[in-house]
Amino acid sequence: MGELQNRAHRRQSSRRIAVCCAPSRQDRRRPNASLCSATTPRRLYGVLLTFAAIAAAIAVSPQSAQAWGPNAQKLILNKSIDTLPPDIRAFFDNGRAQLLEHVNDPLNEKARKPAERHNQFLYLDKYGRFPFTQLPRNYKAAVAKYGKSKLESTGLLPWQVGVYSARLTEALRLGKWEEARLDAAILAAYVAETHDPFNTTENFDGHLTLQNGINERFGTTLIDRFSSFFPMRPNDAAFISDPTDHAFESCLAAHSEIEIILLADRNARLNTKPYDDEYFDRFYNQAAATLIHQLSQAATDVGSYWLTAWTNAGRPQLPH
């Protein structure tokens, strides 16, 4: 799990937020719409839903899951620096360029190293019903109950957050400042992923509900189109007593938002072309509160994990 940091080092030794309606098309860029088939007639819905589920089981791998897009990761990281107390903000602010350069390392590594993909999701709905108490949060206990192969197939995200939280703590304790910034960037990426609802479900791209590609529309396209127009208001960073357990809680909270997003997508698709500007305007208007909340919570948590690592390292004096 340290491969990302090593490769990077070699390269470079509260609740809902009120949002505005979608801005007019004249006020923003309009990237090309995604391609998708037209809405399915009602009489065929049941048949096609069954077919989609069968086809998904054969053709779709969990490794295909799409996380927050690159711009989402950078947006979260930028906002997270503002959550930090003055004692440590300068260290991260002065390293902002380096952090932004490496925050998408896990996403890029996923294409090169298949095993990395397991670190970026946790399919909670593979473990019964909410709050998914069948899954132990202690890694050794989870392995003893389900086996390593089962855990890898359903995702290791919260445990990966715990691993990199410990790595950052150790780097700060030893005064390895460059290594600490690299670990901080990678930790930020994993923490952000715990707030992406579609990282927490086997319906990760909408294939089980005939809403294929919804994860990309929600986590990438809406942000690329509208991020200049919505407010993110993360809270101040706070100490986290158990980094791994907190990551599980973030995944649970994100999972509870899935139905809201699926409904917003279904409503936006009514009487619109797939997927035109009108669709994205309508999808944004209905899903923006959830999107902004998740991004804001992610930024709060990234700052909190950094603060926690520094505190657990003994509050060392950081270079400016």
Spans of features found by a protein language model:
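Cysteine-centered motifs
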Residues: C20-C21, C36
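Catalytic Zn2+-binding segment of zinc metalloproteases
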Residues: A192-G206
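Short polybasic linear motifs
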Residues: T40-R43
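N-terminal, motif-rich segments that launch catalysis or mediate targeting to/interaction with membranes
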Residues: S61-L182, I186, E202-S296, T300-H320
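Extended, hydrophobic/aromatic-rich amphipathic alpha-helical segments that build helical scaffolds
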Residues: A185-E193
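Bacterial N-terminal signal peptides
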Residues: G46-A59
